[in-house]
């Protein structure tokens, strides 16, 4: 597709059946920007943000494997997810990548494995490690994440709705953002419970702390000061560990500041993605 657009346009209109096939929607003109969403959701959630970004960028909004219109990879691992996303995004000039939550871990892994392809990173409410441990207090307890996996098989929809509520817990304002997330949750079908459970396993296993100092791309780390899933302390740690990173914290925001605080989020992102 060429030219600017007023809304997202689909490169892959139908749910793909081939393992690893990835759905990408591309819109706008300018330097390329890839958007990577979080667990259990899909790229449709970026909708409110797209007009601002597409005014300055050629935006490629990706449904991560196993989510939205994208098939799961086989095997379903972080490395295979990264490889599938890399294969789906058009080849051209180096990319800016904005990753939220799980998408941030995908973005960091991609930047580490393909440093010539990724020019800069924006990491939103993400963490090098999503479960707490003796040497990492900046995360949820492992038992909490495990309980989500157990509950998926018992009360699938209720568990996902509760997860959405946790993302905006304490956010001010959060009610409108939560309504938007609920509207989009099943807009591209219901993700397979076994795939979401496997994705939780990936989240539980992620530990990118040793890799962070070797991710040299210019990086903007953005956190919500009320985020309980990826606490701001995790973002501050990332910004300090990465060699060319800056940090911004959005007051009153939970885990989805681009929805609850769009103007503050746009200010925090600033001209960073444009290389200025």
List the model feature ranges, each with a label.
Residues 1-33, 51-58, 83-94, 248, ...:
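Alpha/beta-hydrolase fold catalytic core
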Residues 27, 47-51, 60-98, 112, ...:
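Active-site loop/oxyanion-hole signature of alpha/beta-hydrolase fold enzymes
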Residues 38-41, 101:
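Active-site glycine-rich loops that stabilize anionic/oxyanionic intermediates
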Residues 99-103, 107:
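Gly/Ala-rich beta-loop-alpha elbow adjacent to hydrolase catalytic centers
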Residues 112-113, 117-154, 195:
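Flexible "cap/lid" loop of the alpha/beta hydrolase fold
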Residues 153-206, 210-211:
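Conserved alpha/beta-hydrolase catalytic His-Asp/Glu region
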Residues 215, 221-223, 227:
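Short beta-strand/loop motif that positions the catalytic acidic residue
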Residues 253-266:
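Catalytic histidine-centered segment of alpha/beta-hydrolase-like enzymes
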